[in-house]
Amino acid sequence: MKHLSLLFALFALLGMNAQAQNDVIQDATKNQVQLKLTDGSSKFYNTAEVQELTFDNGTITAGQDQYNNNVAGIAFAKAIKSQVNITEAKGWLESAYVKFDLYDNIQKYNVYVKGGQYNEYAQIDSELVRNYGTYGRADVVGLQAGTNYQLKVVPVNGDNAELTQFASETEVLEVKNYSREGFAFMNNYTPGAYKADGTLKDGAKVLYVTKHNFNTIQLEMIKDNKGNTETYTGLGEIFKAKQKGFDTTPMAVRIIGEITTKDADAAQLMSDEDGLQLKGNGDDTEMNVTLEGIGDDATFNGFGMTFYNGTKVEMRNIGLVNFNDDGIQLKGTQHAWIHHIDFFYGNAGSAADQKKGDGSLDVKDDSRYCTFSYNHFWDSGKTSLCGMKSESGSNFISYDHNWFDHSDSRHPRVRTMTVHVWNNYYDGVSKIGVGAVKGADIFVESNYFRNSKNPMLISEQGTDGRGGFADDHDGGMIKAYGNVLTGKSATTFRSHKQYPVEFDAYEADTRDEKVPETYKSVVGEYTYNNFDTDASLMYNYTPVAANDVPAVVTGFYGAGRMNHGDLQWTFNNTTDDTSDAINDALKAAVMGYHTTLIGIMGEEEETSGGGEQGGGDEPAPEGIILASFDGSPSSSMFTVGGSYGDGKITYNSISYKKGVKFDSKGSITFTPKKDYQMTLILGTAKAGRNVKINGTQTTVGGTENQEGAYYEMEKIRINKDTEYILTKGSAEGLVMLIKLEPVAE
């Protein structure tokens, strides 16, 4: 018989049944031992009452309770004795957040907010409290501007009782409003689910969407003109139901963490071109939808967003990576507000000019009264096309406080539309800034152009010459006022003052100066419509001086997601200012991006067979390691080559959707730090029932579980400090899980 003292942190076994009578609830105020059972449940004992655990041939005895071959892991936790340690807290735009250290033996925290519209502490939604493995984080959104906010973090015991004696409060925080300026807000419109003061509109519904519930989230909605309702399942289907136009209830869709195309069923996304789509029956279908990211890591990976028809839509605080076709496109949409978005590289298209993806933000099909503000474009190729050939009206679009960060062209390229471009930061643009084509009317005001080639161009005149930077050779008109041009920007710009015919822009001396009709585009003879001096057509706004734009746009409240997002990059101005090539290092970072989010606090999916709570997917080295490959390795021990495939197995009551495809390119590489018995769990969706290990095909047998749809190979001994490369065996396979059990020393 072996005796295990309380000095051990963790060990694990597998087996069958348990008999327990004297276990207690989890209590963070006491020193406890936790037995994690193979059915996923846990038993807790106070160490003051259980002085010794004994192990005898698979049977564990804790005091008077006996467990027969069914303990998957053992962990010990000391009683907490200090208050929650808050590591960071800040107020932002209509939101605030707090970060805090995690206790080993606390799985849930309640978080409260006070200030602004809350006179007393009010508990925030539990979905806003998340686990990042090494720390916890809570974000509060929908806040009024105010200087008196505080957040309070309270640990919750195993019996769901708050441990208020260990609660901590933040310092006083300031919250500011989003800037609601631009054509989207004309005639007192308030796009989205929020009021102008930042709080939710009356009766608004809130949906919290993660990669786990993207396909399963449900909402009851009005389906016809009689008021009948129906429950719709999945975010894409909920958006489709909005198209009918019968349910105009404001809806705030809050995105938590990263969502990839692998997380989305085909029914929830449209084509590669459209990605996730919100569509109205007509351009005046009232949507009242805000699609917003929570915190600084909300990301769509592999798809973009299309707004098709409809009015009153908003998208904010989300990152877009590896999207197909356009990152965001608007087609026939009115009163749309797209702001604080991080645009990274899309997937390469078939055309030569689509190596960084197609458009990042494109506006088409007679969209009008739209505002694009405080967005960050990271080396985008074709940044923003504004207008096609079909528009016949002015449309009225505004771009303000965007950070064009070493992007290439189309900032924006405007066809036919009337556009106000103000207070944007052109930071090392390599090809073309603002482009006027096909009768466009553009007012370019108080922007900062740092070493940007061709800051303003009119097709087939001025700096553009007769080459035509666009397919549409007709020109348009640009009025410029109050801009700062430095470096290359200043040397390539042609003002009408020096070039009265072959100019790049009419450079006004005052903001209210009208462009005379005698100034026309060389090709097409278009005159400027002077919309910016017509009070009935313009909105109220307050631009800062162009010299102040870089600090504002790159500051804490500036462009992009909160805290500038969880994926950031610093460009080398010496080389990147003039290059329109893909930045290989940035591309690798974008392709390899994954959030560090574990999950909503207390609802995390367990993907390992042991380990301390709050420690992520990889358990302590003494325990069993159960590594999943549900779109990425759950343990940092493993490196995957090739691609992932659908498997959909259920193993030990936990469902897994994806595994590593063991085809000609598939591989898993790892180097264990100790000796293990390795078990491979293969999905029966593929024919493979063996693999090659370092080039040699396995010969062990296994057992097929038809109900769980997996094949469990027999154990294979592997040795510490040895590199193992697993590849395809006799047939194409699908590796769903790898289980490593320590060899007893």
Identify what each model region corresponds to.
Residues 140-161:
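Beta-strand-rich modules
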Residues 287-297, 311-322, 334-349, 359-360, ...:
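Right-handed parallel beta-helix
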Residues 686-698:
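Short, surface-exposed beta-strand/strand-loop-strand elements in extracellular ectodomains
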Residues 423, 430, 434-606:
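Extracellular beta-rich repeat passengers
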Residues 86-106:
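Conserved aromatic anchor
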